[in-house]
Amino acid sequence: MLGENLSVPFNFEIDPKGMVYLLNAEERFKTSPVVLRNDSVVIPLDQFDNELVFLFHNNTMSGELRKQDHRSTLLPVTAEKGKTYRFAEKKNTKAEKVEGVYDIEFTFESGKKERSVAVLKQNGKQLTGTFLKESGDSRYLQGIVEGNKFYLSSFIGSTPGYYTGEVNNDGTITGEQIGSRVHHHFKGKRNSFAALPDPYKALNDGERKKLAPFAMPDVHGNIVSLSDEKYKNKVVIIPITGTWCPNCIDEAAFLSPWYQKNKDRGVEIITIHYERQTDTAFANKVMRRFRNRFDIQYDQVFGGMANSDTVRRTLGLPEFKSYPTTLFVDKKGNVAKIHSGYSGPATGRFYDEFLKDFNDEVDKLLKE
């Protein structure tokens, strides 16, 4: 799926009603139903404004991953009915132990280095896990161990994720992350206490400050501002997000039901979307899809193009590192804390720690 030199396997399931689920480890990621268009089978991947388009040949399909407006073809894709495995197992090979938590260092093609934490779980030859970075995690990866080599992949509708590596004699691991736009090398060492820097300290200097005044349109065309009566004397959570962002999906899946349970406590949410196009019609389309998917009941507004300069300019932030970034605004309208990045449910105990810290911060602000 990444061209002639590398095929990245993934699994999907179509139920009797035509609903499609992308399968990665324990996750069943629901897409839109199959559409028959002329002689093609189309699987809309609305979350990323993409689609899989296939021609059907007996039990196999061939086609492409492309944008829904047909502006570009991203990758060629083939599919075969009935194959439930991801990576084919080789007979008479023993799987080395890979399971564990690792301190990881990624090296980019530019030479830049980035810290990470890998969380890997193993059952025989079957391997699942994720890589955490300060910007977010790689979500649910699934794969296999063959001898001292391991392979992991993931696909939920954007570009596929692929990691391959090996266990060395000293117990360390080395490998590569390969994508349509990235090719990074990594090395790692087991460390059950491995952790990233505190995400609440990445952008906080300890001083509470006002955001730049903003007035942005919601999905109905209404202008929303933090100074609106609705938000006065309330704790307001402001996620900086995008419908195209996989980690933002995990944040919305948490925030939507959380808001339903906590909105009567004096807390509100304004999600600010920065999207891949500045066209209002496009932004409204993808934001409505996002809203419907997660049953969002709080305000969503469109902030502009998805780049760091736009975020900093529209909100008056001195620095911006990653999507999502979440602002905690106190009852006086000051930014009390900023959480950079996101560690989602695929990260296990790191996600549990995030949930505790999030709720503790909200509880503290509500008591002020």
Predicted regions and their residues:
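Surface-exposed beta-loop interaction hotspot
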Residues: 73-106, 199-205, 211-214
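Short, internal strand/loop/helix patches
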Residues: 287-325
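Thiol-/selenol-based redox modules, centered on thioredoxin-like
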Residues: 322-368
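N-terminal "domain-start" segment that seeds a small globular fold
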Residues: 191-228
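Conserved redox-active cysteine motifs that mediate thiol-disulfide chemistry
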Residues: 239-257, 261, 278-279
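Thiol-based oxidoreductase modules, predominantly thioredoxin-like and allied folds used
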Residues: 266-283, 295-307
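Central antiparallel beta-sheet cores of small beta-barrel/beta-sandwich binding domains
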Residues: 2-56, 88, 96-168
